[in-house]
């Protein structure tokens, strides 16, 4: 169903062509206890589209896991893969994506020493991502990279994240608004700077007064209900709507996730994105 405002109806949440979803890492503590019950909970929230957290199938066979997804009208549209697997075994990653008929593969982290993310790390990542992305593209699957803030360091006057984006021939990007705001950046300005490069998004808000950094670390308890923190979520979603970002995944890593996600959904439902 495609409408002109955010709605949560019949298990589907859409913002025009953008389909709302959930990043399953949010429920990393719930899944090991009760997979069927957790899927049922997600369904009750009106969520349909999912991005996995690279946690496997929790002891179920692939067929059993897929059956539980189908029973709850859930679909994994994006699968995650560690950097090393993209480098050493991209065929395994692609097979995992095919298990769900997912059209996106996302990598969340580029290995580097401590807080020192360098140009050499960036160049290594470009090689791995472009090689894997070209391989996936032959099967109609898109590789995206999810920055975590450490990419905002500079080399010879250029931000390393700019270097990544400008040389991303066979891969695109997933913006986590928390991890763009945490280093002191404006997510909306980055969306406008690169209007074609961001294909996916994580919607995650940050507690007011939280001090940021550029090392990719934070206290997960600073994750708060969307619209109550220090990030202008409404402006980000409005810009994402203009750009046609396909999936907007709600993510909440805090211990308050079970009541904050429904509150976040209610907030998104309240937005009037047709207002200028």
Where are these regions (language model features)?
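C-terminal helical cap(s) of enzyme catalytic domains, especially alpha/beta-barrels
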Residues: 257-276
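Bacterial Sec-dependent N-terminal signal peptides
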Residues: 1-19
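Active-site acidic/histidine proton-transfer and metal-coordination neighborhood
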Residues: 48-49, 83-172, 258
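Conserved, mostly hydrophobic/aromatic
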Residues: 22, 42, 50, 69, ...
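N-terminal pre-domain/capping segments
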Residues: 13-104, 172, 273-276
